[in-house]
Amino acid sequence: METVFDALKAMGKATSIELAARLDISREEVLNELWELKKAGFVDKSAYTWRVADNNVQQEQPAQAELPEEITTATVAKISECDLTATIEQRGPQTADELATLFGTTSRKVASTLAMAISKGRLIRVNQGGKFRYCIPGDNLPAEPKAASVSPLWLSASSSACHGVLIITVITPSPTKNSATKMPEN
């Protein structure tokens, strides 16, 4: 009967599923044997593919980054808007990538979590040097050119559900050439 090692040597490289099909045994048995061979230094693993090792020298410890195939699903940490907002308050303006690194999650998850805070006015997103940074309104924002003419001001108030803070935002419309300034309708 052909062994897992012999089959892998004949195939060059293969997945555990391919080896199980060739040997007509369960995938679990193949995986157990492959991990034993890996610990002994006879096979190597990259992603989901196994191959015979170049050198048959015993490795002292397998790499910690490599996990069995059943455990390779990524888990994304749960984060809340309050946690992200508190970090921005402490550390200043941050990009989604920087926040994702701090919280061990994806930048897409960070951006999605902060979208509601932006729409409610609890945070603003500012383009600085080609990167969008999330900021607390009124804190160390980049200098913006002032409008030449005086325009009316409107106040918008919103309360932060996380910290019990009332944030007042001053809205100044930029004047256009052919339009009169109107009050926004709520």
Curated annotation (Swiss-Prot):
InterPro entries: DUF1627 (IPR012432), WH-like_DNA-bd_sf (IPR036388), WH_DNA-bd_sf (IPR036390). Encoded in the Rac prophage. This protein could be 17 residues longer at the N-terminus, which would make a 9 residue overlap with upstream protein YdaV and consequently the longer version has not been annotated. Missing about 100 C-terminal residues compared to orthologs. The gene is ydaW. It comes from the Bacteria. This is Protein YdaW. It comes from Escherichia coli (strain K12).
